[in-house]
């Protein structure tokens, strides 16, 4: 999930649920900001690009050098088949097209992800996920900088707020003593409030406090039953039956039952809705008519789901906002709902199901949520009002917090972090996700290059970035330098951690346990390697008179970098600008407010862009499936 903020968060009085390792969170309140994480994301306009209609094709020869090597080592038969171009197209897999001669052929990746989602051999599945990350990183289009953590400020009298590893913040069971109102800042104007259409972390935080699903996360970060009181899974793991609680209501007092989930899940998964997260419903089998194999009992008390293959993270999906129920009557009563599926919740007063309902919304200024008396746990909700300040100005947010006008602030100005490290109201918690920058593979930046040259160019530019400087001087809260896209701490599905060397898989840089060494000590070696890769890409270098190699005037590099206007994101861009200037490459920075930035990035109107992804659940497939051709989160335009 896309993060909106760049820094970090911890609760002193808040229960923090931390993964094995972390990274640095984005600035929570920017009018832009990502990312869930982090993130981080997207409210951008059109979601999933529909798979093109041609029959899926030859898998890419040479899909990646890493793929070939993996196959040669015999890591998995599937890996070998992908590398050799022998994988038959998978039914339902995305169909990739190359709109740029410099873009990688992406059908082999689409097919591999489809195989990962259907295999029942967990060891083979893990090997194929490593193969997929190899293919992804070989393109050079994804440039990890650090693994997320999160920072925030919270008044000492406030307790009961808790967070999970994925950036969600739960306010419904907060306690502020005699106070019944919490004044909060998460971010600027939210892009979408429809749980099915949201793809940003700040939007998810609003969703988890105003809607509910079959499952949720408790204060310990564990899956707990929510609207479902219990569930049963079949012995083969292919069927789940949930029994819903009695007396569930929408906020308008109408009944809520299993039929609402049948409607909502099919809506979220349909191409007509255009949800960025439609692909997350892929584990669910389809009926002959193409709808999800999800059935409500006649009395609406039970919901039965049949899966394509066993899915170890299925309960996590049931706790994810895209899987929440939405009120069909309200959705379809909105003017223009067929062309604008989110029209029903673009103003205050819409029907919801969680602890709070949106009472008022002054766009770009404030939102007020009030307690929902029809919430099934209403007697446990002590805070009557949540008043959100909508702003991306971290200086103004920090001033409001210090003036006593905010109880919770999800961002801190970069230049204030050092002074807050010992403040009990300042919290740093781990997230499970990666802050990264991305290249548009169809950008004119790569015009006239082969896919191999474009890859070398991107990988060379990546090695120019001083990640240590970014973390030490901008993040400042102990973020871990990133050299993989799948973050440190993510499980492998077999009881271990994915990011490690073992008998079955070794990373290209075995010592650094990743695809390169991001440390300060490796910078000189990385610079030399970057220049060699850029030469492979066709760039010429000359001596600058001081013994340094710089780009020749005959082969300049001019890149446009887009970011939202949060101060930390801009600071990261400026740091990279200086890194690129060391060899004479020019990076022009364009900043926009959050929603404009999201739309530009989703539309592919960029050379290079800031990005961030907080995991939606603890499995590498979440970091990998987002890059298939028709994924609504495929911002780099693979296969398009």
What are these regions (language model features)?
Residues 267, 341-342, 347, 372-419, ...:
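Ligand-site clamp/hinge motif
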Residues 192, 198-201, 208, 218-222, ...:
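Gly/Pro-rich hinge or "lid" segments in bacterial periplasmic/extracellular proteins
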Residues 83-182, 362, 464-503, 568-577, ...:
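Detector for C-terminal structural segments
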Residues 157, 278-333:
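Surface-exposed binding/hinge segments that line
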Residues 144, 152-153, 166, 185-235, ...:
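N-terminal lobe/hinge region of extracytoplasmic solute-binding protein
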Residues 124, 229-277, 304, 400, ...:
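Aromatic- and charge-enriched surface segment that lines or borders ligand/interaction sites
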Residues 172, 236, 306-325, 345-396, ...:
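Aromatic-rich, solvent-exposed beta-strand/loop patch
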Residues 105, 131, 224, 453-578:
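Append "and occasionally in soluble cytosolic enzymes with long acidic Gly/Pro-rich linkers
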């Amino acid at each position: 999930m896309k993060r909106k903020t760049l820094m970090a968060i911890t609760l002193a009085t808040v229960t923090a649920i931390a993964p094995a390792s972390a990274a640095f969170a984005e600035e929570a309140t920017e009018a832009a900001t990502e990312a869930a994480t982090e993130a981080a994301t997207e409210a951008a306009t059109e979601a999933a690009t529909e798979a093109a209609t041609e029959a899926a094709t030859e898998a890419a020869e040479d899909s990646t050098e890493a793929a070939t090597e993996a196959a040669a080592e015999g890591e998995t038969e599937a890996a070998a088949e992908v590398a050799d171009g022998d994988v038959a197209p998978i039914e339902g897999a995305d169909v990739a097209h190359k709109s740029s001669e410099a873009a990688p052929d992406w059908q082999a990746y689409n097919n591999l992800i489809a195989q990962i989602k259907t295999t029942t051999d967990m060891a083979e599945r893990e090997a194929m996920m490593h193969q997929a990350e190899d293919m992804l990183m070989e393109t050079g289009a994804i440039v990890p900088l650090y693994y997320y953590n999160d920072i925030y400020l919270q008044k000492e009298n406030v307790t009961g707020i808790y967070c999970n590893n994925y950036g969600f913040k739960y306010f419904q069971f907060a306690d502020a003593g005699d106070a019944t109102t919490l004044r909060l800042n998460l971010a600027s104007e939210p892009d979408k409030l429809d749980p099915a259409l949201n793809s940003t972390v700040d939007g998810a935080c609003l969703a988890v406090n105003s809607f509910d699903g079959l499952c949720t996360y408790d204060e310990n970060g564990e899956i707990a039953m929510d609207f479902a009181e219990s569930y049963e899974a079949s012995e083969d793991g292919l069927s789940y039956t949930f029994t819903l609680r009695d007396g569930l209501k929408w906020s308008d007092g109408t009944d809520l039952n299993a039929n609402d989930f049948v409607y909502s899940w099919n809506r979220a998964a349909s191409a007509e809705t255009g949800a960025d997260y439609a692909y997350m419903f892929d584990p669910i089998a389809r009926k002959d008519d193409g709808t999800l194999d999800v059935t409500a009992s006649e009395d609406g008390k039970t919901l039965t789901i049949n899966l394509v293959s066993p899915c170890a993270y299925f309960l996590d999906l049931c706790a994810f906002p895209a899987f929440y129920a939405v009120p069909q009557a309200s959705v379809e009563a909105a003017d223009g709902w067929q062309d604008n599926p989110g029209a029903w919740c673009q103003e205050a007063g819409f029907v919801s199901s969680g602890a709070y309902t949106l009472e008022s919304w002054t766009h770009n200024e404030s939102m007020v949520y009030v307690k929902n008396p029809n919430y099934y746990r209403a007697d446990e909700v002590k805070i009557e009002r949540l008043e959100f300040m909508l702003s991306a100005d971290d200086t103004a947010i920090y001033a409001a917090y210090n003036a006593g006008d905010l109880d919770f602030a999800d961002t801190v100005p970069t230049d204030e972090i050092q002074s807050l490290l010992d403040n009990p109201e300042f919290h740093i918690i781990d997230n499970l996700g990666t802050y990264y920058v991305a290249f548009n593979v169809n950008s004119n930046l790569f015009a006239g290059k082969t896919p191999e040259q474009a890859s070398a160019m991107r990988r060379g530019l990546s090695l120019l970035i001083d990640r240590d400087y970014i973390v030490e001087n901008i993040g400042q809260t102990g973020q871990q330098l990133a050299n993989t896209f799948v973050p440190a701490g993510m499980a492998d599905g077999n009881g271990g951690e994915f990011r490690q060397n073992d008998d079955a898989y070794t990373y290209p840089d075995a010592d650094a346990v990743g695809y390169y060494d991001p440390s300060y000590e490796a910078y000189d070696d990385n610079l030399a390697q970057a220049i060699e890769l850029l030469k492979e890409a066709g760039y010429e270098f000359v001596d600058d008179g001081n013994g340094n190699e710089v780009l020749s005037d005959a082969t300049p590099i001019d890149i446009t970098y887009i970011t939202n206007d949060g101060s930390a994101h801009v600071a990261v861009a400026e740091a990279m600008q200086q890194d690129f200037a060391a060899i004479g490459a020019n990076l022009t920075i364009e900043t926009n407010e959050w929603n404009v930035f999201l739309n530009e990035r989703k539309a592919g109107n960029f050379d290079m862009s800031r990005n961030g992804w907080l995991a939606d659940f603890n499995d590498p497939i979440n970091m990998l499936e987002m890059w298939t051709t028709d994924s609504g989160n495929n911002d780099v335009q693979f296969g398009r």
